[in-house]
Amino acid sequence: MKNPEEAADGKQRIHLRPGSLRGAAPAKLHLLPCDVLVSRPAPVDRFFTPAVRHDADGLQASFRGRGLRGEEVAVPPGFAGFVMVTEEKGEGLIGKLNFSGDAEDKADEAQEPLERDFDRLIGATGSFSHFTLWGLETVPGPDAKVHRALGWPSLAAAIHAQVPED
């Protein structure tokens, strides 16, 4: 169990349900240029039903009367995208998760209880290989934060690759 000092620091452990990755249904994602100031499920589908129009300049749609311009963005090669959800507190928090798949061999070991106040379980509800990135009135373009973030894996691989000796 964590001590009170760790609890005060706001540290949390996040446990991924690996089985949810295999069963994640394909999802169609839209990254909108807005904030949803709610920390609970929001009925976005009531307000955003994408009637996407294709033209020479890219994709067009509208959200609550505002014009949107968009583009399709692919997940970097070698990666997969997942839509993750946090399970409610207490839902399934019964023991230490076994990721090795050899539950029979580990059955005799004492299980460490998950801490209901600090641990979170997440699972995948959808998977994607691309998504639509929207901007207000203009296509986001290559300088968008999302494009820069998606470039990091290839940059990290390049700077950590071995340099051949001459």
Swiss-Prot record:
It is found in: Nucleus. One of its GO terms (biological process) is mismatch repair. The keyword Lyase does not apply. InterPro entries: RNase_H2_subunit_C, RNase_H2_suC. CDD domains: RNase_H2-C. Transmembrane segments: none annotated. Its main location: nucleus. The keyword Cell membrane does not apply. Gene3D superfamilies: 2.40.128.680. Keywords: Acetylation, Nucleus. One of its GO terms (cellular component) is nucleus. The modification N-acetylmethionine is found at M1. Non catalytic subunit of RNase H2, an endonuclease that specifically degrades the RNA of RNA:DNA hybrids. Participates in DNA replication, possibly by mediating the removal of lagging-strand Okazaki fragment RNA primers during DNA replication. Mediates the excision of single ribonucleotides from DNA:RNA duplexes. The RNase H2 complex is a heterotrimer composed of the catalytic subunit RNASEH2A and the non-catalytic subunits RNASEH2B and RNASEH2C. Belongs to the RNase H2 subunit C family. This is Ribonuclease H2 subunit C. The gene is Rnaseh2c.
